[in-house]
Regions:
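Transmembrane alpha-helices and adjacent helix-loop boundaries
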Residues: 1-310
Length: 310
């Protein structure tokens, strides 16, 4: 396997990791049934691609893709307030199909012929798969740090409360509507960023890149890895992204494998492979503690010295 091909796989896997993390904000943290994340992935991709093909700056195009996806996500967030989980899932599926139809119809998106995008130049460097990979990894690290901080903040605790019981969250004075809209806005904006990276890394996009099957693929990544965690979507994205290479002999049945994995995980391990309540994660944690002893804190040392002096 050549290094160029390896970086091609890694860059795609990294972009889908970013996309899986975006869905996790909406579904894993806020508990909203989003089944059409590919629509917002596509919005970001087409927005960024249209800007750069018309001479715009690459970084500004990425920001624009985030903004457009985030605005549409906020609108969906408002709509979600009037829908129950099942109806929200169906609505987002419908939005995905509608957006694909729109991408096919508009002249500015290239219609059914798709859109060709030149490789961008960033800080004097013509972006290739290696640069896209490292740039996306940096974005993932930044996002993960922000998510860690968010989970420890009032915003993160409010989302956790809403996810567990929206009614109880309201009784504690949490503005459930506002936080749900914020979760949709942030999650879809990150999906738009992933879309902008994807469009320029591929050099060509068409509506099929954002079809409903892509949404199912991303949902599979998050569910298989573990909803509501940071490590889960990352692991799930890396696992699912590697399947095309592992399943080359059964390329026609790839979507069937994704669906089967998703059904099996929901049925037998709904917490995901490495979710917080997963037996696999529990076993790995015990193994880690056995071989890597916990560092003693100052309080532990004081307690030990006090016991030794008795």
């Amino acid at each position: 396997m050549s290094s160029a091909y390896l970086y091609s796989i890694l860059a795609t896997a990294a972009i889908f990791t970013l996309l899986a993390l975006s869905l996790n904000i909406i579904t894993g943290y806020a508990g909203q049934a989003m089944m059409g994340i590919a629509a917002f992935f596509g919005l970001g991709a087409y927005t960024a691609a249209i800007i750069t093909t018309n001479g715009g700056n690459f970084l500004l195009a990425l920001v624009a893709g985030m903004l457009v996806s985030g605005v549409f996500g906020a609108i969906l967030g408002v709509i979600s307030l009037r829908l129950q989980a099942d109806f929200l899932a169906i609505t987002t599926i419908g939005i995905n199909f509608v957006m694909v139809a729109v991408f096919n119809r508009l002249k500015i998106t290239g219609g059914t012929l798709g859109l060709t995008i030149k490789k961008p130049v960033l800080f004097g460097l013509k972006m290739n798969n290696m640069y896209f990979f490292y740039m996306t990894v940096v974005l993932i690290v930044i996002l993960c740090l922000l998510l860690v901080k968010m989970r420890r903040s009032w915003f993160g605790m409010a989302l956790a409360s809403i996810n567990n019981d929206p009614g109880a969250a309201r009784s504690f004075g949490i503005n459930v509507n506002r936080y749900q809209i914020l979760a949709f806005t942030i999650g879809t904006a990150v999906a738009g960023l992933a879309g902008g990276m994807y469009a320029h890394r591929m050099g060509f996009i068409s509506s099929s890149d954002f079809a409903f099957v892509v949404s199912i693929q991303i949902v599979s990544m998050v569910v298989i890895g573990g909803l509501g965690t940071i490590r889960g979507p990352i692991f799930g994205a890396l696992l699912i992204s590697s399947l095309p290479e592992l399943l080359r002999f059964a390329d026609d049945y790839r979507e069937l494998v994704y669906g089967l994995l998703l059904v099996l995980m929901v049925r037998f391990m709904p917490e995901g492979l490495i979710g917080d309540d997963s037996p696999v994660w529990g076993a790995l944690t015990k193994l880690w503690r056995r071989f890597v002893p916990k560092k003693k804190t100052r309080a532990d040392l004081i307690a030990e010295s006090a016991e030794g002096g008795r």
